[in-house]
Amino acid sequence: MKKLFIQFYLLLFVCFLVMSLLVGLVYKFTAERAGKQSLDDLMNSSLYLMRSELREIPPHDWGKTLKEMDLNLSFDLRVEPLSKYHLDDISMHRLRGGEIVALDDQYTFLQRIPRSHYVLAVGPVPYLYYLHQMRLLDIALIAFIAISLAFPVFIWMRPHWQDMLKLEAAAQRFGDGHLNERIHFDEGSSFERLGVAFNQMADNINALIASKKQLIDGIAHELRTPLVRLRYRLEMSDNLSAAESQALNRDISQLEALIEELLTYARLDRPQNELHLSEPDLPLWLSTHLADIQAVTPDKTVRIKTLVQGHYAALDMRLMERVLDNLLNNALRYCHSTVETSLLLSGNRATLIVEDDGPGIAPENREHIFEPFVRLDPSRDRSTGGCGLGLAIVHSIALAMGGTVNCDTSELGGARFSFSWPLWHNIPQFTSA
């Protein structure tokens, strides 16, 4: 609100200031023109008075004579020697030319008496002093108006700002996965129509997600059913050799794995994910899981590099198992002989690291490997197995848990994947669509 208030207030104040300056310039031009005319008339009248009243009096007695005259003026009118005033060259030239010269610091005007070394001095003039004071008053008035403008601007902006905060909070909650979030503004609010549009958008997104879920469930049923029938018929067939039967079973298993990965990715790639939280002994779970992996892959070395004991807060172990399996499968697929795993605990974050001694991943490709169906050539392609969704699923799980996943170079020479997540107990729990 502070930034918006300052922007709007400055715009309003600058517009007001420009208009005031324009009006002031017009007024100043008019006032100065009228004042100059009045001053000329005053000086001419004074000179005429001097010619008529002081004609027979010597110049050195003019000042004394003027003092004795009762002119009933609000300012002094006196005759003084020109040498009394130390003027700059420009002012002196103007004065000798018969022009009126103003002494701003003394609020006095001077005009040379023709054919003499005397000047007619008028002042101090109260009007000039008043004009000087008016300048100070103008500055004070502008400052007062500037302060006065801030109050109505704040009063006008406050309800709008509250509605904006309300809309921002609703949009933030909706973006965090609370898809039932709706917003309602008071009748007459400037944001009422925007609130209606937001609610319509939310309803449409909810309907789209529900339709997507229904489509995924339908695809799962329609694809799995013929695969089950195909596997059953394959088992019942006597016309295939053992090698052919084994090859077909392998192809069917790959199709089933691909379907399962696609469905898993589709379920994760949405703003709502139902997290089933528990507080397991994560170091024990990791040790047990790696022992099982080592048992089924005796030709590779799968070991723990670093294991930090501690409390790892609440986790969805179903998702954590998928993360570990996908990272280990990826490492085992491309390693030469060794895969190392670490579990670290630092402050309010935990990190699961899986690294291998394989060919590694070039820096320019590390941002793209978490996209679905991305394969890297020549060492990481379809010939090594997999469907190209494993790391994309890991990335989606990281987003669901409020964490991150990245890739860099391992000390073993291959790729090093780091899956990091916050240790907050308030990990967002979303309701399923």
From Swiss-Prot:
Induction / repression: Induced by low extracellular levels of magnesium via the PhoQ/PhoP two-component regulatory system.
PTM annotation, UniProt: Autophosphorylated.
PTM annotation (Phosphohistidine): residues: 276
InterPro entries xref list: 2C_sensor_his_kinase, HAMP_dom, HATPase_C_sf, His_kinase_dom, HisK_dim/P_dom, HisK_dim/P_sf, Sig_transdc_His_kin-like_C
Periplasmic side, ranges: 25-135
Principal location: membrane
EC nos: 2.7.13.3
Membrane protein topology class: Multi-pass membrane protein
GO biological process, one term: signal transduction
Compartment list: Cell inner membrane
Alphabetical keyword list: ATP-binding, Cell inner membrane, Cell membrane, Kinase, Membrane, Nucleotide-binding, Phosphoprotein, Transferase, Transmembrane, Transmembrane helix, Two-component regulatory system
Keyword Transcription carried by entry: no
GO annotation, cellular component aspect: plasma membrane
Residue spans crossing the bilayer: 4-24, 136-156
Enzyme kind, highest EC tier: transferase
Residue span, Histidine kinase domain: 218-425
Pfam families: HAMP, HATPase_c, HisKA
Domain called HAMP: residue spans: 158-210
Role noted for this protein: Member of the two-component regulatory system RstB/RstA. RstB functions as a membrane-associated protein kinase that phosphorylates RstA.
Protein name in UniProt: Sensor protein RstB
